[in-house]
Amino acid sequence: MVSSPVASRIDAVSRFAREHGWHLMFQDRLGSGHPFDWVGDGVVATIRDDRRQLAYLRHLASLGIPIVDMTCDRPDFPCARVSCNHVEAGRLAAGHFLERNYRSLVFFTIDWGNGRERFWRGFSSAGSPGKWVFSAECPNARWNDWGAVSNWLERKFASAPKPLGALTYSQAESVLLLSAARRLGIRVPEDLGIVSGGEDKALLECQPVPITAVDMDMGRGAYEAAELLQRLMDGEAAPARAVEFPPRRIIARRSTDATVASDKLVRAAIELFASGLKSGVNVESAARALGVSRNTLNRRISAELGRTASAELQRQRLMMAKRLLADPKNKVEYVARMAGFSSASHLGSALRADCGLTPMSFRM
């Protein structure tokens, strides 16, 4: 396995190796000591732009060793591929922002390439987002010069519309974006919503504002890559096209925990919905607390958000439930009660209607 040390990928390939009696070796793709004298039966890899890794993999391919790539970044490298559908991932992120009423969107990345282009294609299908590509605007700067990237981001923020929804290609880019925003006093998520194009729970949950991510289901991809490699080692011909699978879901965290609204009454209603879930707030009681009729509240919310007041309240309940379900210590009954559902079965029905998952499968 020649890859960056992503735990979900390593765990999945290791599981397949145990199940099928493989002798698995791991080589960091960025390492300098690639073992050119190694002669094995097959390789699963994450193929990027590192010259040493490419030279090593070309050497292995010249020996007739089958290779399965777990990314879509280097389609020019001749090998079998299994990767997440990046176009669908970009589209999923755009839908997440639009559901929260972020109308100005931007895609931020340090560099460009096939995977990023596919993310952008899906993201831009929802409208006309901006594109911030550091390497295109600062071609003489190093991609890992975080000071230069940060200064450039501050200049971009100065002229950007707000509220702004920003999708990044990688976890590291989302953390950098959050850091630059905090230095400028830009509120996240009120003025800037952030979605990372990759999930890394350990990194994204420890941020001052935990960052929402697209779950690219890398564990599934790695396991399917190992399955394909086994078939290639058994003599099966490589598929003519890359094997793609859909992104699993959006993992919502605080960086997009807002519904953008210009109407003060709508903002107040959203805040009331969110704060009153545990106490059983409904549209009628919210309208009464805000001093307007139910019809007025429904009309104003529909005009601002494009959905009814009841639909927005249900969305707030589901957002709360999903956040609580992310912690395995929270029992489903507790989650249902805190999110304003009448029972665990009521929550289960709502979650299945929303994303096709039960509370237990949502946690997996």
Positions of predicted regions on the chain:
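Bacterial carbohydrate/catabolite-sensing allosteric modules
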Residues: 1-47, 51-289, 298, 315, ...
